[in-house]
Amino acid sequence: MTASISSMAASSVRISNLHKSYGKVQVLKGIDMQVEPGEVVCLIGPSGSGKSTLLRCVNLLEEPNDGTIMVGDTEVTDPDVDINRVRTHMGMVFQQFNLFGHLNILDNCTIAQIKVLGRSKAEAEAVALEQLAKVGLEGKEDRFPAQLSGGQQQRVAIARALSMNPDLMLFDEPTSALDPEMVGEVLSIMRNLADEGMTMIVVTHEMAFAREVADKVVFMADGVVVEEGPSDQVIGNPQHERTQAFLARVLDPTHAVVD
């Protein structure tokens, strides 16, 4: 099976009985999860719960040991899938920006368009400039990553991902490496994407963002889904003791965040 634009267009995600181990250490223990087109799903939970591993399995940056992942009509876990083609329909934003330091901002946002999508340089630059303007970086296309703040670099990473016209965006703790005063500018961009109907899976410790923006919150611990549901329900009125304990520590300023 190979991915095609039409089969990916639904941008839904179906994860069934997903298992992932590193040696004898089980990181994911039978995860089931659904993301509908246009939904924002936030994954929350303590460090070591498997959130980032689950996210990285969606585009096979990590290969699961068992289970299935469907993105649209494409089974990502099919051994015959053209994963590189599938990935062209998914954008991913990492904690550490992962920009090319030797390229200016414009080139960072055009290189994949040209090499992967086959766009002309002129077309790629037009798309990149549009996306850079969208994230508030108009006029900074000639600068290099080292000349930007952390928040600006992360916004470049988002613009770079959006320049590929993805059907699905994956965010792996996109604000965790930022100074506190820079977090808001990145979350604002993500709010705008949600308002535009982008399908998003977000690993985050930003509970206010999750409660405000997420259609669904999934609380994970020890490699399993402990609780999931609408954000107001899971964050505002959690039913499971493990979720209650985690949120009490995260939301109570007198306690250290579990991270």
Predicted regions: what is each one?
Residues 1-19, 254-259:
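ABC-family P-loop ATPase nucleotide-binding domain
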Residues 2, 221, 232-259:
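C-terminal boundary and immediately downstream tail of ABC-type ATPase nucleotide-binding domains
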Residues 8-231:
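ABC family nucleotide-binding domain
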